[in-house]
Amino acid sequence: MVDPVAALCNYNVLEVIFSYLELDDLSHCSQVCKSWYHFLNDENSDVWRWHCLNKLPKESLKSDLLASVSTYKTKLRAYFHAWSPNDCSRNVYIKPNGFTLHRNPVAQSTDAARGKIGFRHGRHTWEVIWEGPLGTVAVIGISTKEAALQCHGYVALLGSDDQSWGWNLVENHLLHNGDMQGSYPLLNNAPKYQVGERIRVILDCEDNTLSFEKNYEFLGVAFRGLPDKKLYPTVSAVYGNTEVSMVYLGTPLDG
């Protein structure tokens, strides 16, 4: 019979030890034994709470931006998948909350940003929230590392080459390799995007497809035949002082 006092003591000791480890180390610890796996599998445990409160900006924890990720562990994961301050146009900066990009009001420029982590395997979904005016062109989608992040003029930068795929929210057009690939979604009088709406981007690296959801409604597959390359969440914007947030959600739920 397990002594409940000893079990509680062991739990508290593990909690303290795991709180001082790096996140990569925690991943390795979860593979040591069933006991440690079950301990770390509690995504709202004090261990994940401690790491969440110490690594995430307080501003993001106080806002409703992370409403779609309910546990401490998923909030941490979203933070490490957010926009990269090192992989964006010089006219873009990432706000202190870590999840929102701000495009500076630079004339005759189109500017883009990529997420910190790209995907080549599995199925992934993330939310994009355009929190400022769209301007004449506002594109969300994916790109490889080779896709450009800045160009002259006000254009649909994302989707302008063979390294990027995008949905222009202003005109409801799909874009790739500099060509319009058709209207999207395929609905009669499809409603235009409203600022503040959450769009879910669904990347399936097994079926090589990209799809979108809005207001929990699946809008259909937008792109097929995606290459076997690492693909990154990406947006491109033209409007000065507009802001776009991105929250990684993990594996999409079917149904």
Swiss-Prot record:
Cellular component GO terms, alphabetical: axon; cell cortex; cytoplasm; neuromuscular junction; nucleus; perikaryon; pole plasm; SCF ubiquitin ligase complex
Effect of residue 239 to A: Abolishes interaction with vas
B30.2/SPRY domain residues: 61-253
PROSITE patterns: B302_SPRY
Pfam families in UniProt: F-box-like, SPRY
Observed effect of gene inactivation: Dramatic overgrowth of synaptic termini, with a large increase in the number of synaptic boutons and branches. Also impaired synaptic transmission.
Subunit structure: Component of an E3 ubiquitin ligase complex composed of hiw and Fsn. Interacts with Rae1, probably as part of the hiw-Fsn complex. Interacts (via B30.2/SPRY domain) with vas. Interacts with Cul1.
Protein name (database record): F-box/SPRY domain-containing protein 1
Organism ancestry: Eukaryota, Metazoa, Ecdysozoa, Arthropoda, Hexapoda
Name of the gene this protein is made from: Fsn
